[in-house]
Amino acid sequence: PFTYVKNSYIASPEFARGMPDFIKVCNVVKTFKQTRILQVGPRPFDFWTVICNEGELLERFNISLSPVPIQEVVQEIKKVKEQQPDKLQAVIDYFETNTEVQISARDLEMVAALKVALQNLCESYGCNAGVIQCWTALQDEIGILPYASLSLLQEEGLPFVCETDVHGAISELLVEAASLGEHRAIFADVNCRHPENENGELLQHLGVFAYSTAETKPILPQRHFVFDYPGSVAFRAIKIGRASCRERV
């Protein structure tokens, strides 16, 4: 069930391959044991596939959640706008430099403020990842979708997963830990069993990818393809081997 680094010379291929693998495994275990996840809002009713057992995660694996209401995020956004103008402007500058911005300056400011606010809350609660209820209560409060903000958090090594998918956030953390933080995880946010193939599943990406996974320049469109709100991001992801995808969230 496991492998080990056999007795070998330091200059041997076996040692060169085995030692990095050992370090990566240690990093995965360390990350798993030190995970706390910020949960913004409750699970949407229809998303039964993302139910998790919070008590079991804590008792068996010491993985804890830090639930916060959406209103707390709204208050943090106000603080960011009033007290952290430099951080806010730095995020705005990033979007203006690295994306094709098609939304208004006001909406772009809100996208940037949401990113900083979520980052602040993760720091305050000691969280290394987050999950969020993406719609529609958030739009009622701040008028934007969170995807462009979340993609930037992903880019900076703070995984955020949609619709409070706690297991998805844990998966991202472990994948990135296995690469020692050199690569960003790509997570298919909605996965459902195939209706005919018992050994198959349907992957539909409804979450967020890091900007570094983009093959084309990301676009911040005026509206989402489903919801009439700004705050989404669209780009074609880099093709790796047999897998490729197009993000439009």
Regions found by a protein language model. Name each.
Residues E56, R60, M110-Q119, E123-R248:
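Anaerobic metallocofactor- and corrinoid-dependent redox/one-carbon enzyme cores
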Residues P1-Q89, F95-T99, I103:
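Cap/lid and interdomain-hinge subdomains that line or gate substrate/regulatory clefts
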Residues A105-L108:
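Active-site helix-to-loop segments that bind/position phosphate- or nucleotide-bearing substrates
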Residues F2-N7, A243-V249:
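Short intrinsically disordered, low-complexity coil segments enriched in acidic
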